[in-house]
Amino acid sequence: MDFIELLKVIFLGIVEGITEWLPISSTGHLLLVDEFLKVNLSKDFMSMFNVVIQLGAILAVVVLFFKKLWPFSKEEKNFIKKDTFTLWFKIVVACIPGIVMIPFDSKIEDLFFNPQTIATTLILYGILFIIIENRNAGKQPKVAKLSDITYQMAFMIGLFQILAMIPGTSRSGATIIGAMLFGASRYVAAEFTFFLAIPTMFGASLLKLLKFGFTFTGAEIVALITGMLTAFIVSIIVIKFLMGYIKKNNFKVFGWYRIVLGAIVAGYFLLAR
């Protein structure tokens, strides 16, 4: 892999690290970036690459929130952290709808992976973010901490995650919207979304790897490792930024950004015909 191609892969890793956690759709951005960069690797590999580099992003969540996610304590009397185990059970419950939909993943991708759908979902969920923020303005959230999330609420958030199977939706965007609709604060909605990403994105990456196979060329191995490492580093920065940002600000800016990006995607591919 030459230096220019390596720079392209690094740029894709940067885009993944930023857009995976901000509710602005990594798919929509990667579609635009790939349109201009044209990485010199097979189409099938790039389809798999765009999903598998999420492993780097997942690792960032594990590293940043390890103390909160690790269910065991050094204390002899309280070796098992019950609250953490309960949180993981709720995450498993939230994963159930997605697991049920696994057989339909490829069909949905084949049916909806096009610029028109991506532009539409970018704009639609951008509008939803603005509407929800306007609705919640001045109200105290009913769910102010992770332990307030019930099993029923976790399952409902998982249903919203199914919507992210449609390209352009944004997995984080869909689950944050779902959590906020059920009364979660912005911080809790984002935090639960990040934790839910661990099994969800790991599973999606594993499925893509199994579908593609584990036979890679030297250039493809370099691309995967570089992309994952870049996504990991950028994700660390972005997650820290977002969690600090939403303590004092709302999601409206991301809603407006989605609307503008959706219009750009629609306009570009309409003119490119």
Curated annotation (Swiss-Prot):
What superkingdom does the record give? Answer: Bacteria
Q: Give the main location.
A: membrane
Topology within the bilayer? Multi-pass membrane protein
| GO-annotated cellular components | plasma membrane
The protein's annotated catalytic reaction(s) are:
di-trans,octa-cis-undecaprenyl diphosphate + H2O = di-trans,octa-cis-undecaprenyl phosphate + phosphate + H(+)
> What EC number(s) is this enzyme filed under?
3.6.1.27
Keywords from the UniProt entry:
Antibiotic resistance, Cell membrane, Cell shape, Cell wall biogenesis/degradation, Hydrolase, Membrane, Peptidoglycan synthesis, Transmembrane, Transmembrane helix
Under the heading InterPro entries, the entry gives: UppP
Q: Name one Pfam family in it.
A: BacA
Give the subcellular location.
Cell membrane
State the family named in the UniProt similarity comment for this chain.
Belongs to the UppP family.
What NCBIfam families does this protein map onto? PRK00281.1-2, PRK00281.1-4, PRK00281.1-5, undec_PP_bacA
| Protein name in UniProt | Undecaprenyl-diphosphatase
Q: What gene is this protein translated from?
A: uppP
